[in-house]
């Protein structure tokens, strides 16, 4: 058994030529490294036609004579979208899905002891009769060999697949499939715990290996405990010869039990409130072609920075490296068959069914995967077709429920969970539809598979009022999905901005739907998610202020609303070192169902009128209310406030003078506002809003050590305003 990473030494042509597959090739080719995209696109104003092409890859290699009599397998992690593989001019394999892995047996075409050539005909055109193509698509699909490639040398008989069903109580079943002559062979399985303890089990090929491991630590969101299963295919020795290990396969897994009922999702018997985001697997410039480190970083951002406990892989199975990271972090994954809205003819459907099978077989050992998407996202009902997708998935994995994202009510429910794209919120009233009005079967599970960004696109450089509205919309739906009984949770649309086709987006080929931009920089709405995390130390405290407090940047110089997104116990506000007020979350207000409701800053005056105007406490409080109302309502006053002015013997000029002295900036220096997050009685984080005196930026390097390993590597560098923490 030998394994080789095969991501170097490839040659690329943007225009496929049949000469590419021949042993000798005089074509002018470009050296490339895998992962590779067929066309690097600009960040915006790109043209989707540029990556739609029939292109080719070629790699020469030497096949030593030691490989003769063995099986040589070449595995592609993903090729977008239609791939035909040749070896020494022979067509060996065709694969019609750009989102799943496939393996090609090169053995019969190899010339041992000689140079050999593998070539790939890669078709990334969008007129292919395979998912997701056939209709309009609200995302770009890119092209190329964009996931890793590997070569394995095995015996003629080998393990093709290993699958373990492992319940939270410790019961397990191990299923295997083999290739080649295996008569008389046996199986040996070993389960290794995180502590290093091992348990061995023997079995026959015809039956699953079953058993119970005592004292297991179940995989959960808080404690994502991973075990390792190693299965060996053994040919017993004869004539006094020892047993021979023909093949060995190792997978990671977790003991856990998933159940969806009318009351929600239960993981290991404990109810979980899903708080997730949808993730496209694309990035700026390179499309799908990113190394494992960046795929893993997305999972870390979702779990550690945004505080999510779940992610939906829109709208396809995604990188194994991403799923590995989700396993390690405790991030639940709702993955789905490739496609968007369109259902094609019978040829298209046959490929879609194959995609479902490949998705399940390639992802089912990941404990983070808790839900299969058995429908094309947003598509119409198709009873015959969706009966087949559900049957195919359940046959390969009876342990997980199925779902399918819909964009209409009372859809035929063949799955275990009704997943609904709820874009009903328009900024007022209920933020999500009543579950009973949407699902045809309230006895089954229900979740919101999309909401938010699509209905209120927000650019990172939009004005603060626009950015605040998006953030509060996300908060409203999160709140109402928690408050409504029977809703298992929600997946906001979406994690990050993404490139799209001309029919969608903001006219520049970008959908600005994310809580992050395309480079994973946070928008204000990211703080809605991040602030829902439970703080265990001061470093976990989030403090994000919606307003820059720069009146000169606002229409008419009229202040906008100011909200703070935080998981602290309270927030203290200071103006030029004068304490204004301390604000706590409103546990009975609009966002009361959230673990950490956003806090509206409603008082910018506090006791300043006592200190500087000589007012008694009662008069100062009444006058402060008038000034805060003027700030909130663009200098307009209610009849009640006008009556209070009379009782305080204040004229309009008096009120205007105090307004500009304590809230506005006319005639005086711009104030400095300081917001402090209070946690366990102490200020642990600070945000200061003041006119810029000097530019000071903080550089954060994600993945700072680049590793030229199985593939090329990349760092993500964020430049931002420094974070201030208050010494404790």
Features from the language model and the residues they span:
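Accessory beta-strand-rich segments of carbohydrate-active enzymes
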Residues: 3-16, 37, 47-48, 52-159, ...
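Beta-strand-rich binding/interaction modules
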Residues: 87, 171-203, 560-582, 673-677
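Active-site-adjacent substrate/metal-binding segments within catalytic domains
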Residues: 38-63, 67-75, 80-87, 93-96, ...
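Accessory carbohydrate-binding/adhesion or oligomerization-edge regions at the termini
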Residues: 1-42, 121, 194, 471-478, ...
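Extended acidic/polar, glycine-enriched regions
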Residues: 111-115, 180-259
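Short S/T/G/P-enriched beta-strand
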Residues: 531-561, 567, 572, 687-715
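Single conserved hydrophobic/aromatic residue that forms the stacking wall/gate
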Residues: 718, 722-728
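Substrate-binding/catalytic cleft of secreted carbohydrate-active enzymes
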Residues: 173-175, 300-304, 310-527, 532, ...
